[in-house]
Amino acid sequence: MREVVIASAARTAVGSFGGAFKSVSAVELGVTAAKEAIKRANITPDMIDESLLGGVLTAGLGQNIARQIALGAGIPVEKPAMTINIVCGSGLRSVSMASQLIALGDADIMLVGGAENMSMSPYLVPSARYGARMGDAAFVDSMIKDGLSDIFNNYHMGITAENIAEQWNITREEQDELALASQNKAEKAQAEGKFDEEIVPVVIKGRKGDTVVDKDEYIKPGTTMEKLAKLRPAFKKDGTVTAGNASGINDGAAMLVVMAKEKAEELGIEPLATIVSYGTAGVDPKIMGYGPVPATKKALEAANMTIEDIDLVEANEAFAAQSVAVIRDLNIDMNKVNVNGGAIAIGHPIGCSGARILTTLLYEMKRRDAKTGLATLCIGGGMGTTLIVKR
């Protein structure tokens, strides 16, 4: 089978809930990132054979947001596009699925990634279809229902983090320490301009002129253990998971161009990385945050590698509790993981996050001249997905 490379990667800044992107749809964010990824790959939109793009909260956005983004980016109508929803893993799974198609010869060049605007997720009125026959009619938050609730146990994702904290004996202090490290690293990285190269500015038109958003909005400078310790448990009365040691509710898009290695050579393109292996696995939905462990073991086995062979790791910080469990059980060197902060600081726009962490990983690998990298996320519903790349 053919080798597959990543030719380019670009992302928007990550916006806060109700922040800069509150009126910029996931499609618009996706188009901006897609155009930039295509430009950075030094190809034209008509060279894209197919688009596979992640998106989770798509209610009210119209049919197949991947198709909307593809056409918005100038890709011809003859080229197909498909939206992928494997919740938080969508943006990364799109990459591994595209690599399968390319390896088999079904495509040469593909657009992959993900886009999400959690701020714009609508409320649903299920009883409105046939009429609320008697009593009050409830509004259902589609963001919670379709993105942040465990359908199998009927509770919030935060409870799955509490379950892990209890089962793995992870203390509140350990969680806050990881959260603090994430914030401090992200604050430092942003101040040093480390995210600038990967971010494409989003121009928002307004009555008083244009606003340019080119900085991650959610990072909280000046975070301390004292401030984190004051926060109350968010999901359980005597729990340990707080707003401070959990990821944010965010908006953003990240896109990449992947292609056959032989096509890159033909076009004279120097890729960011080569895709080595990938793995997706399931766990009990009650401990969904543990999903990266079996997924990573699967990817490492496929690559005939050990975790010690990996130079840099981006492990999505859905919650500090699950991050501690994953890092501990995979025996990941803390000096290699989320070196510029993670989702607790930067944010977690769910359908975009897989592509966001991969984009961040690729640029940091380039900066450090790292040879191997691994990106992994836990997935609501009890799964994990991992991708390994090399330079």
Curated annotation (Swiss-Prot):
Output the SUPFAM superfamilies linked to this UniProt entry: Thiolase-like (SSF53901)
Primary localization: cytoplasm
Active-site residues? 88 (acyl-thioester intermediate), 348 (proton acceptor), 378 (proton acceptor)
Q: A cellular component term (GO) from this record?
A: cytoplasm
Task: State whether keyword Zinc-finger applies.
Answer: no
Q: Does the keyword Cell wall biogenesis/degradation apply?
A: no
Q: If you read the UniProt record, what top EC class would you report for this enzyme, in one word?
A: transferase
Q: What is this protein called?
A: Acetyl-CoA acetyltransferase
